[in-house]
Amino acid sequence: MTWRMGPRFTMLLAMWLVCGSEPHPHATIRGSHGGRKVPLVSPDSSRPARFLRHTGRSRGIERSTLEEPNLQPLQRRRSVPVLRLARPTEPPARSDINGAAVRPEQRPAARGSPREMIRDEGSSARSRMLRFPSGSSSPNILASFAGKNRVWVISAPHASEGYYRLMMSLLKDDVYCELAERHIQQIVLFHQAGEEGGKVRRITSEGQILEQPLDPSLIPKLMSFLKLEKGKFGMVLLKKTLQVEERYPYPVRLEAMYEVIDQGPIRRIEKIRQKGFVQKCKASGVEGQVVAEGNDGGGGAGRPSLGSEKKKEDPRRAQVPPTRESRVKVLRKLAATAPALPQPPSTPRATTLPPAPATTVTRSTSRAVTVAARPMTTTAFPTTQRPWTPSPSHRPPTTTEVITARRPSVSENLYPPSRKDQHRERPQTTRRPSKATSLESFTNAPPTTISEPSTRAAGPGRFRDNRMDRREHGHRDPNVVPGPPKPAKEKPPKKKAQDKILSNEYEEKYDLSRPTASQLEDELQVGNVPLKKAKESKKHEKLEKPEKEKKKKMKNENADKLLKSEKQMKKSEKKSKQEKEKSKKKKGGKTEQDGYQKPTNKHFTQSPKKSVADLLGSFEGKRRLLLITAPKAENNMYVQQRDEYLESFCKMATRKISVITIFGPVNNSTMKIDHFQLDNEKPMRVVDDEDLVDQRLISELRKEYGMTYNDFFMVLTDVDLRVKQYYEVPITMKSVFDLIDTFQSRIKDMEKQKKEGIVCKEDKKQSLENFLSRFRWRRRLLVISAPNDEDWAYSQQLSALSGQACNFGLRHITILKLLGVGEEVGGVLELFPINGSSVVEREDVPAHLVKDIRNYFQVSPEYFSMLLVGKDGNVKSWYPSPMWSMVIVYDLIDSMQLRRQEMAIQQSLGMRCPEDEYAGYGYHSYHQGYQDGYQDDYRHHESYHHGYPY
C-alpha cells in the first residue's frame, strides 16, 4: 500500500505545482477590461500584441469568438520566457510574424479584443490624434487651428435663415484664395433645436474647400465657448491665438473682415512671406471647388480618395530611389493603396523591385498581404514605417501629420518631390534643405525637419534681397540727380556757354543737385518776365554791349582749356557783382540776361533753403497753398481728399488755390503741383519736370511745413504762405472754403470779384461717378423716385419724413428726390447737418444726372420706389411702397457696424435727438427697441432688407 500511494502522492504534488505556477486567466482578462496596460504579448501563438492588433482588426476578429475556442491552448503557452518575445524589435519576433501571418485567415470574422484597444489608447497621445485626426468630432476642435489658422465661425439657426443665405451669397468662388492667403478656416454651426449640425470648411492653399461634418454634440459647447446667442445669426472671427478678434451680428462684406485682419502686426509678416500667393492659388484652377469628406475619426469616407491620390503620386516617388531602404518604403506605400485595388496587382509591384536580400522582399510581401484584405485604417502607417525609424520620438509626428492632413496636404507631406518644387521656387534655400531631403530618404522625417532649415535659410535670403535693393538704390541715386542737367542744357538759347559752365562746376564742386536748382532759378526768372515788359525792354537796350562782349568771351572759352574758362568766368562774375552794387535797375537786368551764370554763383553762396524760398516766392502774395503728403497715389485717404477738391474746381479757382502733393516716403518722394485757375488767367508753370523729383527740394519743402511723416497730412496756407490749418484726416472742402473766406486777404478778393462780376460757373456736366463719390464713406443716401410730386405713395412718404431732420442728421442720411418722366425730370438733394440741427441745405439735381441715377440703381420712373444706399455705395434695402414709420429704416441703419461706432462717438459727445421724434426709440432705449420692435417688423420686410455693415 505504501508503494502504491507513493506515486499517487507524487502525481498530486506535481499537478499542484503545475497548477499553482500558471496565472489565473480570469484575473488577466479582468485586468485588461479594467484599463490596465497589459504586457506586449498577444494570446495568439506568442506573437507581439501590436502586430496582432492590426491583423485582428483588419480581419474583423471578434473578441468573444477569439477567446472561447482557443482559451486553453493560449493559457498553456503563457510562461515566463514569453516576455522576451514581446519586444517587436528583436529578429526572432519578425520570423514569427512571417510564419504566422496567414493564420488569421482561417479564423471567423470578428473585432479586435478590448484589451488590445485599451493598449492602443494608452500607448501615447499619438493614438488619440489618430482617432480624432481632423478634430471634426473631437471636443477640442479649435485646438487643431491654434497657432496656424484664423477661424471664422458662422452661427445660424438653420441653413435657410436669411442672414446666413446672404452671407453665403457673398462667398463667391473667387474669394477663397484671398481667405487662404490670410489663413482663414471656416466653421458653420446650425443650432436650432432638432436641426443641430455643422461643418468644418478647411480651405487649402489652392483655394479648394474640404467640408467635413461636425458632431452635433459639439454645437452647444462651441456656442457657449464663443458666447454666441441661440436663435440669432452671428459670426465670430478668431485670431490664431483663438482669441476673439471681431464679432459680427449680421453679414459683412469680406473687405471689412480683411481690413480687420490686415491691421495686425503678424499680417504684415505674412504678406512679405506670401508674395504672389493669390496668383499661384488662382492659377491652380480649383478655387471654390467643394469636396465633401466624411468624419476622419473612424477612418471613413475620405480615405479611398486619399489612397487614390497617393496612387497618382507613386510614379513620381518611384522615379527617385536613393537607397534600397527608400525603395522598400515606396513598396509599402504602394501596398497601403492596395485596398482600393484587387489583390493581384500588389504582387508584380513586389517583383519589380531591384535585387535585394530575401528578407526585404518577403517582409514587404507579407505587409501587402496583411493590409490588402481590409479597408485602409490609421494604424497601417505606423506599422510600415516602424523598421525605418529607430528612435520612436521621430515617428509620432510623422504619423500624426499623415493622418490629420487632408487630401492636398498628404501629397505635400509624404512625398519629397513636392518639397523639391518648393525649393525650386526659393533658390536661396537649396543648400540646407538638400541635407534634409537626404535624411528623409532614410528616416522619413517629419515635415518640421524640412521646414526649419528652409525658414532659417529664407531669413538671410530676405536680408540679402534688401541689401541688393539698397545697392540698387545707391547706384540709382547718383544717376537720377545728375540726369536733369541734360534736358536743362537744351532749353536755354545759349547752349554752348551753358554746357560749359555746368560741366566746369560739376567737376569742381561735385554738387549733384545744382543743375536742378539753376534750372529752377531760370524758370522763376522767366516766369517773371511778362510782368515788367516795358522796363525790361529799356534794360535790354542798356545792356546790349556788355552782352555782346560776354558772348565773344564764351566763344573763346570753348577753344581754350578748362582752367582759362574758369578764370574768365570769375572775371565775368566780378563784373556782374560790381554792376549789381552800382544800381538796382541793372540788378534786375543782370538776373535776366546773365541768368545762366547767376544761379550757379548763388549756389556757391546760398543756403539750401533758398531753393525752397525761390519755389515759394512764385506763390507768395498770389496764391494760397494746399500741401498734401501721402504714402502713395492710391492711398485711400488721399483719394478721398482728391475727389473732394476736384468736385469743387471752380470754387478752388476763385479762391486762388494751388495744390502741392508729395507722394512716397520721406527719403524718396515725388511731387505734383496743380493750379486751379479761372479761364481769364494765364497758366502758371512754376517748376520744371526735373524739379518734381529733386529729393533735396522736396525734403526742404517737407521740413518747411513740418510734413516729415509718411502718413496722410495736409496743410493750408494763406497768400503770405503762413500755415493757417493742419489736417491729419480728409476734410470736406466746404469746411476749408469757410475757413478761407474768413481770411482778410480773401475778403478783399471777394469784394474785388463782386465788382468785376467774376462768378463761378460750372461749364462741365457733373458725372454720375463724381456725384456718388461725394457721398461715399461720408453719407448714406435715401433715394426716393416717383413719376410726379402728386403721386399718392410719394406724398405719403413725405409725410412720414416730416420732423425727422435730427434723426437723419445724426445717422448721416441725405435724401435724394427724383421726380418726373421722360424729358421733364428733375431732382432735389437735401443735406441734413450731422450735428442734428434742423437746418437743411437743398441743392437742385440736373436732369441728365437724374436719368443716370435711375439707370444706375435700376429704378423705374413710372412707379414709386425708395432705396437705402450705404456709405460704401451699395444698396442696403428696397422699399416698393411707402414706409409709414421710419423706425424700421433706423433700426436697419443702427444695426450696421459703422453706425455702431458713430453712435459710440455721439453718445460720448452727448449728441442725441428728442425721444418723441423717434417714437420712443431714443439712444438710451435703442437695444430694447432693436429686440422688441425690429425683430417683429423685420419678418415682414425680409425680402427687402440686406444687412450690410455700413
From Swiss-Prot:
It is found in: Secreted, Extracellular space, Extracellular matrix. The keyword Coiled coil applies. Phosphorylated. This is Coiled-coil domain-containing protein 80. Residues 104-119, 308-317, 418-428, 462-478, 487-499, 538-582 have a biased composition (Basic and acidic residues). Residues 376-385, 435-454, 598-609 have a biased composition (Polar residues). Expressed in dermal papilla and dermal fibroblasts (at protein level). Expressed in heart, thymus, placenta, pancreas, colon, epithelium, spleen and osteoblasts. Pfam families: DUF4174. Residues 560-587 form a coiled coil. Belongs to the CCDC80 family. Induction: Down-regulated in cancer and after osteoblastic differentiation. Up-regulated by dihydrotestosterone (DHT). Residues 28-64, 88-119, 289-609 are annotated as: Disordered. Residues 1-21 form the signal peptide. InterPro entries: DUF4174 (IPR025232). GO terms for molecular function: fibronectin binding; heparin binding. It comes from Homo sapiens. GO terms for biological process: extracellular matrix organization; positive regulation of cell-substrate adhesion; response to bacterium. Its main location: secreted. GO terms for cellular component: basement membrane; extracellular region; interstitial matrix. Keywords: Coiled coil, Extracellular matrix, Isopeptide bond, Phosphoprotein, Secreted, Signal, Ubl conjugation. Binds to various extracellular matrix proteins. Promotes cell adhesion and matrix assembly. It comes from the Eukaryota. There is a cross-link at residues 545, 548 (Glycyl lysine isopeptide (Lys-Gly) (interchain with G-Cter in SUMO2)). Residues 348-374 have a biased composition (Low complexity).
